[in-house]
């Protein structure tokens, strides 16, 4: 026991000593590490950076495309040297692990070691590589203890794709005259394997050609894939070829694919056109152009209606003067010879044409596998032309000429001479165009002279030129004609006076614009200096024009017309003298109508005014007929009403004063004039009046004073009808102051003679005025104010009283209808 207890203190002492040594060692170690850290920090400051030792260790990760397995398959292993000091856990993430594409493709066996596995085959063409992240964490804390490792897993390529053409079949067209060695088509195949590797390198091969011809073939460039022509193509031999092309890669094992190319040969011009006949003869009449005088047939073995078949003709020799032209018939391919310029038998009765033919497309030939230009000249034919004689037309020398003459030349003035020649026959001249009939031509000599005065202002003159056309006609069969033209230039003279323009002759002015100036325009067909500027002057010798009108500003061709006072509605004449630049003038009249305007711009009642012109012209005629009808009615009344054997009264034989009486009473009002007033006005001529009962419009005689009644009784006498000389008795008047009428029948003719003479004179004057107005061609229409419609005068045949014997007392009971006539006759002293 004592020994055991003695050992224990020594053990404890040894243990304490060890702990002290460990503490000192730890302190020294910490101090050393601190010093080292400080030293390293200083070295980092004062020394360049150095690469630290890698703590990640990873084997090469390689994965072959389309690896058959078995799966899962180990592809690599990870290691981190920090696993010596602590317990670590490895993590993997990224595309192929937990991200697209290919989720779940890679994984770790467990998290304690870094073995990496793949779980299925990989298509490199889909995903050529994967970028994955590796991390290491402390198992106890889950804290990442080192920097993440980023690793790119590359998928190695295998030759698993063959080259592919974009189409299974190709259709191309090649010209027959395609030059050998030139590429005609480019083949291209695509290999999806890794680029710039043998797996994606493509080579091209021509496997077969159908048909296989020795002189016509194709070849393919192995690297570029261009198809080239070897030799010459012949459309007639092989119009189409079929080529089988293969594309192969250089991988192990190599893969390939094929495609078919159909080559259509488009025919070229490799056959020369040839005339079916080498010599032609044709007869052509002289003096006229002709179409299709000859057709030349050619043969061509190329395909019809192509540019290699269509013929193109050309006149190589004999057409130096341009008489001929040749074209091609598009349907038959024939050459059509035309005469476009008339031939002349006298100049060249015969000639020869050399015509050549070629195609629209260039002609080529194949020799020794190469295209060569033609060595022979184009095919030709000879056409012998025989010109037949015909009647040549005359020819003018010169065909047209200009003659300058002053207008107003007298008849017989020589204008010029036409000269025509015809080697075959005689010539006569005919005038065919002379619209104004101013000239004549001598049929033998062609001399043109005037037969009428010529006027530059004629409508047949255009820009001072008057055209005269002459024909020269020969006496051949059939007759031929030539045309010559004389251009007559007329110099102007001052032979026209200025005149008013049509729109300035008759002008309308609204009442509201009567003080605004009117623009009066004039014109003169003469040229400078015989025309404008014009001078305008008012004719002050005519009426009161200077008191009403005034001329304003002169514009050369027009002048302002101003009014000096207000004018009522109506028609006015404004006389003007208008002179040209040389002083030649003439009096002109402007007709101005002042009228109302509803809109302020245009006169109204235009239609009524036009009708008024005709009514005004017919008014004197109508008045004459009305006066005649009234006179006849009056005579009929006197004849049938008055009794021939009534008492007469002595009447003075004086004619009396010819005082005008106003017959404008249009109503049935009562007259305010007494018999004494009438008697005072016309004392020398007493005309009887009678009333059948109470007469409207005339006072009863009972209301008249005795003196006036006696005078009135003397004025009532018995008169026969006009010109009949039959006496009549006045009707009884109910008045105590009335006296019997004079029974002398010879008084009738004495009283009617002056009245009948005045009536005949008046009718003759009216008829004369009507005839003058009707026959006067220089009458200018006037506008009159509206006076109503003119009543038509009834014809004599419409008066029934002339056709039968009427009772003497027929007119005694007319009543109020005859009152206006009785008033008029009683006021004027005419017997009723």
Swiss-Prot record:
Residues 813-832 are annotated as: Disordered. GO terms for biological process: adherens junction organization; calcium-dependent cell-cell adhesion via plasma membrane cell adhesion molecules; CD4-positive, alpha-beta T cell activation; cell migration; cell morphogenesis; cell-cell adhesion mediated by cadherin; cell-cell junction assembly; homophilic cell adhesion via plasma membrane adhesion molecules. Gene3D superfamilies: Cadherins. The chain crosses the membrane at residues 615-635. GO terms for cellular component: adherens junction; catenin complex; microtubule cytoskeleton; plasma membrane. InterPro entries: Cadherin, Cadherin-like_dom, Cadherin-like_sf, Cadherin_CS. Residues 35-165, 166-275, 276-396, 397-500 form the Cadherin domain. Residues 1-27 form the signal peptide. CDD domains: Cadherin_repeat (cd11304). Residues 28-614 are extracellular. It is a single-pass type I membrane protein. It is found in: Cell membrane. Expressed by epithelial cells of gastrointestinal tissue. SUPFAM superfamilies: Cadherin-like. Pfam families: Cadherin. Residues 636-832 are cytoplasmic. Homodimer. Component of a cadherin:catenin adhesion complex composed of at least of CDH26, beta-catenin/CTNNB1, alpha-catenin/CTNNA1 and p120 catenin/CTNND1. Cadherins are calcium-dependent cell adhesion proteins. They preferentially interact with themselves in a homophilic manner in connecting cells; cadherins may thus contribute to the sorting of heterogeneous cell types. Ligand for integrins alpha-E/beta-7, ITGAE:ITGAB7, alpha-4/beta-7, ITGA4:ITGAB7 and alpha-4/beta-1, ITGA4:ITGAB1 through which modulates CD4(+) T cells activation. Three calcium ions are usually bound at the interface of each cadherin domain and rigidify the connections, imparting a strong curvature to the full-length ectodomain. This is Cadherin-like protein 26. It comes from Homo sapiens.
């Amino acid at each position: 026991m004592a020994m055991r207890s003695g050992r224990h203190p020594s053990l404890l002492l040894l243990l304490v000593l060890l702990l002290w040594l460990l503490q000192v060692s730890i302190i020294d170690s910490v101090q050393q590490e601190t010093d080292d850290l400080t030293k390293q920090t200083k070295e980092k400051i004062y020394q360049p950076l150095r690469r630290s030792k890698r703590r990640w260790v990873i084997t090469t990760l390689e994965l072959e495309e389309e690896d058959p397995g078995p799966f899962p398959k180990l592809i690599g292993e990870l290691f981190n040297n920090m696993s010596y000091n602590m317990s670590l856990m490895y993590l993997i993430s990224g595309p192929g692990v937990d991200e697209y594409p290919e989720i779940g493709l890679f994984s770790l066996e467990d998290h304690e070691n870094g073995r990496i596995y793949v779980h299925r085959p990989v298509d490199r063409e889909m995903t050529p590589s994967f970028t994955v992240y590796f991390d290491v964490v402390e198992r106890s804390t889950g804290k990442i203890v080192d920097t993440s490792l980023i690793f790119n897993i590359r998928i190695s390529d295998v030759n698993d794709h063959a080259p592919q053409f974009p189409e299974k079949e190709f259709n191309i067209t090649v010209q027959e005259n395609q030059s050998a060695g030139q590429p005609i088509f480019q083949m291209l195949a695509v290999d999806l394997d890794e680029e710039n590797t043998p797996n994606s390198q493509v080579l091209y091969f021509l496997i077969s050609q159908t048909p296989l011809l020795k002189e016509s073939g194709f070849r393919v460039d192995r690297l570029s894939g261009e198809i080239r022509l070897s030799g010459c193509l012949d459309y007639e031999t092989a119009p189409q070829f079929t080529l089988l092309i293969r594309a192969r890669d250089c991988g192990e094992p190599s893969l390939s694919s094929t495609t078919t190319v159909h080559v259509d040969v488009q025919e070229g011009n490799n056959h020369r056109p040839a005339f079916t006949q080498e010599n032609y003869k044709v007869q052509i009449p002289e003096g006229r152009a002709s179409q299709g005088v000859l057709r030349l047939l050619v043969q061509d073995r190329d395909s019809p209606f192509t540019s290699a078949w269509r013929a193109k003709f050309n006149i190589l020799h004999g057409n130096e003067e341009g008489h001929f032209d040749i074209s091609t018939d598009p349907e038959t391919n024939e050459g059509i010879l035309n005469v476009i310029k008339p031939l002349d038998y006298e100049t060249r009765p015969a000639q020869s044409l050399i015509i050549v033919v070629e195609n629209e497309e260039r002609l080529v030939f194949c020799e020794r596998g190469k295209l060569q230009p033609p060595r022979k000249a184009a095919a030709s034919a000879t056409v012998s032309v025989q010109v037949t004689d015909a009647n040549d037309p005359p020819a003018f020398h010169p065909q047209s000429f200009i003659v300058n003459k002053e207008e107003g030349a007298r008849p017989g003035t020589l204008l010029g001479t036409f000269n025509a020649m015809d080697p075959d026959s005689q010539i006569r001249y005919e005038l065919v165009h002379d619209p104004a009939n101013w000239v004549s031509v001598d049929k033998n000599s062609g001399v043109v002279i005037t037969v009428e005065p010529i006027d530059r202002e004629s409508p047949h003159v255009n820009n001072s030129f008057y055209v005269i056309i002459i024909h020269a006609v020969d006496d051949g069969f059939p007759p031929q004609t030539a045309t010559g033209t004389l251009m007559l230039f007329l110099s102007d003279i001052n032979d026209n006076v200025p005149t008013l323009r049509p729109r300035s002759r008759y002008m309308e002015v609204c009442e509201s614009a009567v003080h605004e100036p009117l623009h009066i325009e004039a014109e003169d067909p003469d040229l400078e200096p015989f025309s404008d500027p014009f001078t305008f002057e008012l004719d002050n010798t005519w009426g009161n024009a200077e008191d009403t009108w005034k001329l304003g500003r002169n514009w050369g061709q027009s002048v302002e017309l101003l009014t000096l006072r207000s004018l009522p509605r109506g028609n006015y004449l404004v006389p003007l003298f208008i002179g040209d630049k040389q002083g030649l003038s003439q009096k002109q009249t402007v007709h101005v109508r002042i009228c109302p305007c509803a809109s302020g711009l245009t006169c109204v009642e235009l239609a009524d005014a036009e009708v008024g012109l005709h009514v005004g012209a017919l008014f004197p005629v109508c008045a004459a007929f009305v006066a005649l009808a009234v006179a006849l009615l009056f005579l009929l009344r006197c004849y049938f009403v008055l009794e021939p054997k009534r008492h007469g009264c002595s009447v003075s034989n004086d004619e009396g004063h010819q005082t005008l009486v106003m017959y404008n009473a249009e109503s049935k009002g009562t007259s305010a004039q007494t018999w004494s007033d009438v008697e005072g006005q016309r004392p020398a001529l007493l005309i009887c009046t009678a009333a059948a009962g109470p007469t409207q419009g005339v006072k009863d005689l009972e209301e008249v004073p005795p003196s006036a009644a006696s005078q009135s009784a003397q004025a009532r006498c018995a008169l026969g009808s006009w010109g009949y000389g039959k006496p009549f008795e006045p009707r009884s008047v109910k008045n105590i102051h009335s006296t019997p009428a004079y029974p002398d029948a010879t008084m009738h003719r004495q009283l009617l003679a002056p009245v009948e003479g005045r009536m005949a004179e008046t009718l003759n004057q009216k008829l004369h005025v009507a005839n003058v107005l009707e026959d006067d061609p220089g009458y200018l229409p006037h506008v009159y104010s509206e006076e109503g419609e003119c009543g038509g005068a009834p014809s004599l045949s419409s008066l029934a009283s002339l056709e039968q014997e009427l009772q003497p007392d027929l007119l005694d009971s007319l009543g109020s209808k005859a009152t206006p006539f009785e008033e008029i006759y009683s006021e004027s002293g005419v017997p009723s």
